[in-house]
Amino acid sequence: MKVFMTSSPMGAYRSEGPPPFRGLDPANGMVEELRRYWREHSRCLLISAFPDGHDVNDKMREDFGRIFRETGLSVECMDLCDRRNGREITSELMRYDMVILGGGHVPTQKRFFDEIGLRDAFQGWDGIVMGISAGSMNCAEVVYAQPEMPGEAADPSYPRFIRGLGLTDINVLPHYQAVKDDYVDGLRLMEEITYPDSRGRVFYAITDGSYVLETGDRKEIRGEAYRIADGQIRQVCRKGEILALK
């Protein structure tokens, strides 16, 4: 399996203007890496993080198909998985060459993954996974469900660490350039929530256009990234650079 854990591969989060490129973001060699493993006429599956947002999901499926074709990737189909067909389509996962795990709210997406049995469905599957934002976070064995919605940081019963898909042992935090100064429940997201939660753990905060790539023989950060561990943060990779994690 080849796992691309991205922040946003189609433009900057919270940006008002269109991205300065067509298709997928070519920064940090992501398109070249995708092409390295891409099969001609790939069958692609988009698994939504909003299982009941049917109209939004249908539009998203159309957008992804267009974006992949604009990138020059050969696509036979771009199918959609949401609550209308979840169990049925994951039982046929072996038909697909590439799976996209969409962005959204981490716990909501995780509950849907559990509902459709996605973790088990990935067993023995050998294709390309592209996680986007929450989809990248949920790839981990133990997911850090960083508080983001009102009430989550203040709620002592909110589960900040949950069982994920088990595709990696890396915890990715997306959109660092956009969220680093955010507040949740009156607390600074990074300094007062995330840094304390990193005690005894390691998180990698990445900016949009950056990603983590894990294959059978490689585990790399591509682009701007920051290592958060034991309450401290430091930059470990810059745009255009590669950091091997093993």
Name these PLM-found stretches.
Residues 11, 53, 106-107, 136-138, ...:
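Glycine-rich nucleotide phosphate-binding loop and flanking beta-alpha elements
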Residues 41, 96, 125-126, 168:
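Short, well-ordered alpha-helix to beta-strand connector turns
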Residues 44, 99, 133, 172, ...:
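A residue-level signal for conserved active-site and pocket-lining positions in enzyme catalytic cores
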Residues 92, 115-127:
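Catalytic-core regions built around general acid/base machinery
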Residues 106-115, 182:
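Glycine/threonine-rich flexible loop motifs
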